[in-house]
Amino acid sequence: PPPNTRPPPNPPRLYRAWARGGTGLSVTGNVMIDRRALGEPCNVVLEDRRDLDRLKAWARAGREDGTHLWMQINHPGKQAPAALNRETVSPSAVPFSDPNLKRFFHVPRALTVDEIADLVRRFGETAALAKEAGFSGVQIHGAHGYLVSQFLSPRHNRREDAYGGSAENRRRFVLEVYDEIRRRVGDDFPVSIKLNSADFQKGGFTEEESLAVVEALDARGIDLIEISGGTYEAPRMAGQGQRESTRRREAYFLSYAEQVRSRVKVPLMVTGGFRSREGMAAALEDGATDLIGLARPLVLDPAFSNRLLAGEDAVSAVAPIRTGIRAVDNAAMMEVSWYTLQLARIARGKAPLADAGGLSSLLKVAGLIGWRRLRMGRLRAS
């Protein structure tokens, strides 16, 4: 059967828990702009007004107590599993080089110029619908190897037209997406982007190129930049491959944020690795970031933000999920499954179950959505 792409009835309860827990800005999981291109099982798709009532309920719940709720909008490009999609598209017909990934993805078809224009339009349409539904902002997903990230990367974008070649041409797509969203939502509606600091791959998107994108978006008036990094092939967004010095400092991408801050004044958010009030306060006091992005700590404790704001010397209990079976422990999908089930518990009005087993969580999620689909479940930041 085709995947269910409607907003489920339970996000209001989940996002209400975070709003009541003191979080000032919640950014949704990625909402897709085209139901023909799904990145993960159960993606919500917003391309028309058919589910506006559910979206309005979601927005109302997530905005309780003055919380901002921004919709993250996305297109997966070639990171669209074959189990969910008949074909995949990308800037160029470049397949994954990793043989483990090749088994789960089609070789992508290169987008035509007309199709690129349609995707730009779709980003704008989804943003306008999010505003109509009551969300207080939107975020372009320009990181983690999805379509916007693919256009930016010379490893994946080998076009020879106005959208490829030079770094300036490769950032044309993201700038057109931003301009179209801004045109549709107006100047007073927050628009942000989640952007890779780098792809961490040979021949990929570099830090210097990323800084140039930041400067171009800043000149256009973007409201917030969230810094992340990595792709399916080099998943730094999950904390893999980080140096010990980086782990001690907590935030994965703080050094890059300091470079950004030296060039632009746009507000920055760093997500990934923050665990303690002390580490967050240090990052803010250093001026490297303006907002602290949290993910896994808010799954274990939806009220963690309230504890921080109350002045408690709070440290999140986030820790690696281990079974003792090396092959299982090295698979990022086990931790993704574990946190997915905790989110489902919160959405049902239950407390997170911190002592839930990793292997049992993996098997349960595999049973619910199918093993093949699970294999390509998204790696989530921290």
Map each language-model feature to its residues:
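Flavin-dependent oxidoreductase catalytic cores
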Residues: 1-382
